[in-house]
């Protein structure tokens, strides 16, 4: 009779050893509570995915959000991050600072949340694969999570039939050389991604 009572605390302790602890440190302009809840709910799905591949048990994410792009660019200059003059992306992940930085929320709440999911995915990939993960994998996973929504059934990707057809057509017409694409460096990959 005592054995089950003695084993129960051991079972709980072992469960805690396996628990994933992810802390998000918010900085910059304040986010509404609803956005924080959405981010934390979404991140739980990302963490469950990346845990399968060796994501550390305890992890701190730094998320720096700016409402205004101009303030974000000034901040980047102050921390010695220099972007090209015509840089159009709405967010970056800085491996040097280990921080996701959102460069303005002018495009609205839904779009900025998608960018946050994208940039935090870069952090997870680097935690697993180190400083130089393959560009196609790093960007591919980030793009995947950027285009997902949380539903009652879990995470659902918003990949449209048009996008599926376009990729299939590009491959069938030989517009994509998958071997070269997989082996391309960051610069070449990013150039191809823009097309």
Predicted regions and their residues:
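Sec-dependent N-terminal signal peptides
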Residues: 4-14
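Short intrinsically disordered, low-complexity coil segments enriched in acidic
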Residues: 13, 119, 193-194
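Residue-level marker of positions within ordered structural domains that often coincide
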Residues: 14, 68, 147
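Sec/Tat signal peptide C-region and signal peptidase I cleavage site
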Residues: 15-19
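Juxtacatalytic substrate-recognition/specificity segment
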Residues: 20-134
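Acidic/His/Gly-enriched intrinsically disordered linker/tail segments
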Residues: 84-94, 100, 129-195
């Amino acid at each position: 009779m005592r054995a089950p009572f003695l084993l129960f605390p051991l079972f709980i302790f072992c469960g805690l050893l396996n628990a994933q602890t992810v802390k998000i440190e918010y900085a910059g302009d304040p986010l509404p509570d609803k956005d924080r809840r959405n981010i934390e709910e979404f991140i739980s799905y990302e963490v469950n995915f990346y845990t399968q591949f060796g994501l550390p048990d305890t992890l701190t994410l730094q998320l720096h959000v700016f409402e205004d792009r101009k303030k974000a660019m000034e901040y980047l200059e102050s921390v010695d991050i220099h972007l090209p003059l015509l840089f159009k992306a709405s967010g970056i992940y800085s491996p040097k600072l280990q921080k996701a930085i959102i460069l303005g929320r002018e495009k609205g709440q839904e779009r900025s949340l998608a960018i946050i999911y994208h940039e935090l995915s870069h952090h997870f990939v680097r935690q697993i694969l180190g400083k130089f993960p393959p560009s196609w994998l790093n960007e591919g996973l980030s793009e995947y999570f950027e285009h997902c929504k949380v539903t009652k059934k879990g995470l659902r990707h918003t990949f449209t039939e048009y996008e599926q057809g376009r990729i299939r057509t590009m491959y069938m017409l030989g517009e994509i050389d998958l071997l070269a694409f997989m082996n391309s460096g960051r610069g070449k990959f990013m150039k191809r991604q823009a097309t």
